[in-house]
Amino acid sequence: MRCPTCKYNGTRVVDSRPADDGNSIRRRRECEKCGFRFTTFEKVEESPLIVVKKDGAREEFAREKVRRGLIRACEKRPVSAEQIEEIVNEVERELRNIGDSEIASDLIGEKVMNKLANLDEVAYVRFASVYRQFKDISVFVEELKDLMEKNKDR
């Protein structure tokens, strides 16, 4: 690997350990010429997931979009950045485990809502109100009733 400082092509691995829950390897490297130390990450290259939108349009799955939606829903709620990142990781892992290269956008939204329902009810309602595009208050109230019923069963 090329040194980012002097561009010499010879480096040696000083330390290697699992990262990202075993999904990647973090390596500390040292340039054999100038001694500069830097970190690299090695990760399996995965084939892209294609999201099929409601209008039939297709685009590559973007973790950042899921993360932004979660951050917005969890704003001013007792949900940590680590919990949000874990939801993003779980949703992506579940989608990849389906084994299909094309995923309906509805499925992504449902998976995120299921995770939020178990984590924070207010964040769940916020996300659901945007995702399900509540047209009026009666639909919103119905969603709240469903959530309250589910909580009785817990």
Swiss-Prot record:
GO terms for molecular function: ATP binding; DNA binding; zinc ion binding. Residues 49-139 form the ATP-cone domain. The keyword tRNA-binding does not apply. It comes from the Bacteria. Binds 1 zinc ion. InterPro entries: ATP-cone_dom (IPR005144), NrdR-like_N (IPR055173), RNR_NrdR-like (IPR003796). One of its GO terms (biological process) is negative regulation of DNA-templated transcription. The keyword Metal-binding applies. A zinc finger (unnamed) spans 3-34. Its cofactor is Zn(2+). Pfam families: ATP-cone, Zn_ribbon_NrdR. Belongs to the NrdR family. HAMAP family: NrdR. This is Transcriptional repressor NrdR. The lineage of its organism: Bacteria, Bacillati, Bacillota, Bacilli, Bacillales.
